[in-house]
């Protein structure tokens, strides 16, 4: 639905009707309710992909700390994360997905208020909705790890994963070793992962 604002009125009506018939939120990504302890990717973007998070390095660090703090209360494990100037990605394990999403929503509200004050932009829409996807397989898990760690390279911010400071990539490489990280990259390629929904 990120293309919604670019659609004609007829295309918008058709898109909303399509979602309504499938009992999905009319203007937002669906949030599937899963039972039990499961793994998910969670992604969220700044409204219209503006580089609001990345206004300053300090704000990037603040966003990273805030998001990871939320995860520390509602996730049993954070496998991978990456904070970029206009969006973030997480790979987590949780049995409290609803509570985690709710707290991320509150976190988005607090950061919106704070950042809009700092930027003298009261009323600016900062965040778009979160999207969560359940991990379906071993291959999906490792492709997600690779995708998240590769994201700063994909978007042209750095040449190597470990050079991006707002990511778990350097810790991951240190933990598993460069050789194992390279093997995982080769065995679980990103290919077109995220092509239709990642945030430029």
Where do the model's predicted regions map?
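Short catalytic/metal-binding and nucleic-acid-binding patches
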Residues: 1-200
